[in-house]
């Protein structure tokens, strides 16, 4: 058992925040542009909201239709053991974009104007220090990328462009799927139509402005399949009108269900609606690919599909994500997220990677792919998995780690390919240990089983070490 060393790829030991990262729009010397013979590839990051890897056809789901995402995975690489650090939208996205974990970037829960005190749910605002965090968009913008953001920001002020983005179209937090209010480069207006399709059109407008002369980074953060489940086009509901969802393993509402009891009252009916939202998202993929092809940008564009967290949709008798239960849960359905990479002629097709990777590995991987330094002083605990992505062996002296970690409020997790340990309240409990080799659905808590004490204690020490290395 081991935990990752933080800052392993930093270019210096200097403290780095957004203020000393960018001065007058120019990168400071620590992250100055590097000369490069070949043009850097473009990057399109497609982020779903509440899409677990188990909800995709390529992830084994036999009832929800995702042919386009499945095809991207088939023609590229899919990490089947990718886990979000936090099963909640705002902290997970902050980790995805910064490579830092909640105790570092300060967003501990989903951001809402109405947090609940008991049990704690939601966070009123990002801490003031978050504006000084260095996001991937800051790095790429400072290194010559044209950066565009479209969709659900979830990290605070979404009215004006943030963190190095030049093009900005953000939907508000209400997630109204029909006739939504969208802020485009500082001007908010209600727009007619279906939100998901409107966001794809906004992404297309950004791509229409791009040429091969300058690389670009586009984030398309879709609200699908997050509730509310109304407002999607009728054709998607019709697809699932008779679906039984017998294979999804849903259960009646659990005694510790905290939220979403209205969805659990009609689990099959609401699974039909959730599936409709997933397929509506899936149908946006070919539209984005067609626009890239039309602009002559497809071959030099890396496409990544991921999500902030998953949803249970009735598994374990719960509906949403980490806060679906009291205490917070870290089930694979909510921490297991897609991580699909597609780059024609570069990423080997039909690649299914078994290594355990995390959301906090994304920024280091992109930086290595684009030949850019990882921010110095950021205390990043992630590691680039670019060699794995490209089907190349790692150095024998530097094998891939076996364990990833998670944190959500008072709950911490360590997971490898065999075990998952969940510690709450700094180990005071209630705690859980699952032997995933014989219990993949996480039904049998082995925490107090004498047979597993060595494994449990080894993972607990790993969490303690990770906690120390990610402090501050």
PLM region descriptions:
Residues 7, 11, 32-45:
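C-terminal segment of N-terminal export signals and the immediately downstream linker at the start
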Residues 1-16:
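N-terminal secretory signal peptides
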Residues 37-41, 48-63, 170-357, 369-379, ...:
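Active-site-proximal cap/lid insertion segments
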Residues 66, 96, 152, 161, ...:
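Polar, surface-exposed loop/tail segments
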Residues 414-417, 424:
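Active-site beta-strand termini and strand-to-loop segments that position acidic
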Residues 46, 52-148, 167-174:
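Active-site segment of extracytoplasmic enzymes that catalyze sulfate/phosphate-ester chemistry
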Residues 20, 24, 68, 91, ...:
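Alpha-helical elements of Rossmann-like donor-binding domains used by nucleotide-donor carbohydrate transfer enzymes
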Residues 12-26:
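N-terminal secretory signal peptides and thylakoid transit peptides that target proteins
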């Amino acid at each position: 058992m081991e935990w990752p060393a933080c800052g392993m790829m930093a270019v210096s030991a200097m403290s780095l925040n957004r203020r000393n990262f960018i001065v007058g729009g120019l990168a400071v010397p620590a992250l100055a542009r590097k000369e490069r013979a070949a043009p850097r590839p473009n990057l399109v990051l497609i982020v779903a909201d509440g899409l677990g890897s188990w909800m995709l056809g390529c992830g084994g789901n036999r009832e929800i239709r995702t042919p386009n995402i499945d095809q991207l995975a088939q023609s590229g690489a899919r990490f089947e053991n990718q886990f979000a650090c936090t099963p909640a939208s705002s902290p997970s996205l902050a980790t995805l974009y910064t490579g830092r974990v909640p105790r570092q970037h300060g967003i501990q829960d989903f951001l809402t104007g109405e947090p609940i005190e008991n049990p704690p749910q939601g966070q009123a605002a990002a801490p003031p220090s978050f504006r000084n965090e260095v996001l991937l968009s800051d790095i790429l913008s400072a290194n010559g990328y044209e950066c565009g953001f479209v969709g659900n920001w979830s990290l605070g002020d979404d009215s004006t462009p943030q963190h190095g983005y030049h093009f900005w179209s953000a939907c508000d937090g209400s997630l109204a799927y029909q006739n939504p209010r969208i802020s485009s480069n500082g001007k908010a207006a209600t727009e007619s139509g279906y939100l998901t399709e409107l966001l794809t059109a906004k992404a297309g407008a950004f791509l229409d402005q791009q040429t091969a002369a300058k690389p670009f980074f586009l984030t398309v953060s879709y609200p699908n399949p997050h509730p509310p489940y109304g407002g999607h086009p009728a054709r998607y509901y019709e697809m699932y009108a008779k679906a039984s969802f017998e294979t999804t393993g849903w259960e009646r509402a659990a005694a510790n269900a905290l939220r979403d009891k209205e969805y659990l009252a009609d689990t099959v009916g609401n699974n039909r609606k959730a599936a409709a939202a997933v397929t509506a998202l899936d149908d946006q993929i070919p539209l984005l690919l067609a626009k890239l092809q039309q602009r002559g940008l497809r071959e030099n564009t890396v496409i990544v599909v991921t999500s902030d967290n998953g949803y249970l949709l009735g598994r374990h008798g719960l509906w949403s994500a980490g806060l679906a239960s009291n205490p917070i849960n870290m089930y694979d359905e909510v921490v297991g997220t897609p991580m699909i990479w597609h780059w024609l002629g570069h990423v080997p097709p039909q690649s299914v990677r078994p290594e355990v990777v995390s959301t906090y590995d994304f920024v280091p991987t992109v930086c290595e792919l684009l030949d850019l330094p990882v921010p110095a002083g950021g205390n990043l605990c992630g590691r680039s998995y670019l060699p794995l992505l490209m089907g190349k062996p790692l150095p024998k002296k530097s094998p891939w780690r076996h364990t990833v970690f998670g944190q959500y409020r008072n709950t911490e997790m360590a997971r490898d390919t065999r075990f998952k340990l969940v510690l709450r309240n700094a180990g005071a409990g209630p705690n859980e240990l699952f032997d995933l080799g014989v219990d993949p659905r996480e039904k049998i808590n082995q925490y107090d089983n004498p047979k597993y004490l060595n494994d449990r204690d080894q993972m607990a020490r790993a969490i303690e070490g990770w906690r120390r290395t990610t402090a501050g």
